[in-house]
Amino acid sequence: MKQYNPEQLRQEYRALQSGDSRMRAIRTAVAAAEQANDLPWAVRFHHDLIHESVFSGDRYQALIDFPQYLAMVRRDPEQERENLWDTLWMYKWIVEAATEFYQIEKKQVMQWFSEYRRMLLENGYSLRSWYEKRAIFFSYSDRAKMRLDFESFQNAAKDALGDGEASELDSVVRFALEIGDRKKAMQAANQIFDRNLRTEEVPCKTYHYLLRDALKCGDMDAAEKYVQPLRSLCDGQRFQLEAIGMVLCYDALTDLRRGLEFYQKNQALREGSRNPFLCFWFDRGAAKLLTAAAEQGLSGTDISGMVLTPEQLSEKAETIMQNCRTLAERFDARNRSNYFSSEL
């Protein structure tokens, strides 16, 4: 039997490519540490597993593992103190991730927000990140509260728990567009573009918000401007199914053949995702595209490469749209709103 060596286990999974293979290796390390009753290393491994799921997976594993992490770190007051910083960051990741899973009841989401707020205040941190993440949740359920939280986010002091200038400007773009303040949104967006600010998701998300707003307003000139960089930024990215879906919406209106090619190129990402929020937005765009293509008599291919006739495309579009309706009903039931249904 292989001797338990936590440092070697961590070294081994850090050497792997980020994604599913690394996540499997971290789960193996978690099991080994728990079997050895090694609480400090089990806590570290749980942290790494949650981080990997949030930033290189579909966030599904993070939501499963987070309660286990909390139970473990709270067994020992010394461990709880030692891991406070990591725990605060995980709360921040989890309250945002929970927005994307209708399976997490609203009561549980609100409880996590309450716990996160308490920990921030008890340890002298700003509520800026809390307001930002709660505004995201309320953007799908309570627009008035979203607006208030957005204002509080802008007014709260910055501190070390912030996501950095690029991400915070990106949030300003998002929420300013949500409340119809396009001037403020463009001021923030231009800072990102002019200064070439970058994160793993910025400016991809920024272009996505701008494209979505342009399509809602019927401004196809602006939409064409934003879709060009967005297409290359989101293509093949498992995190960006929402943005890919928005590109498909654009292609459904402008270039069906290009849209079919883009859809076929990225549909494997959709099939491999366990994130219902991302799947909803991808499916919404796919259904619009395939419906329009079928109406124009175009054919396509499925994920196996089999050619689909216009009639088969139409049937596939209806199947996808029915899945969208189901997801919309489930999110709206959890959120107690009609946001997702209204987006169909």
Model regions: which residues?
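Generic helix N-cap/helix-start motif at coil->alpha-helix transitions
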Residues: 1-10, 21-22, 42-44, 87-91, ...
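Alpha-solenoid helical repeat scaffolds
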Residues: 105, 124-128, 132, 142-186, ...
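Non-membrane alpha-helical segments in proteins
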Residues: 7-15, 28-31, 40-58, 85-99, ...
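Long, repeat-rich segments with strong aromatic
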Residues: 184, 208-217, 221-225, 233-260, ...
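C-terminal non-catalytic interaction modules
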Residues: 268-344
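Residue-level recognition of tetratricopeptide repeat
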Residues: 51, 136, 174, 212, ...
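Helix-turn-helix repeat elements of alpha-solenoid scaffolds
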Residues: 15-28, 58-74, 101-115, 138-152, ...
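Solenoid-like repeat scaffolds
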Residues: 30-39, 70-79, 116-125, 151-164, ...
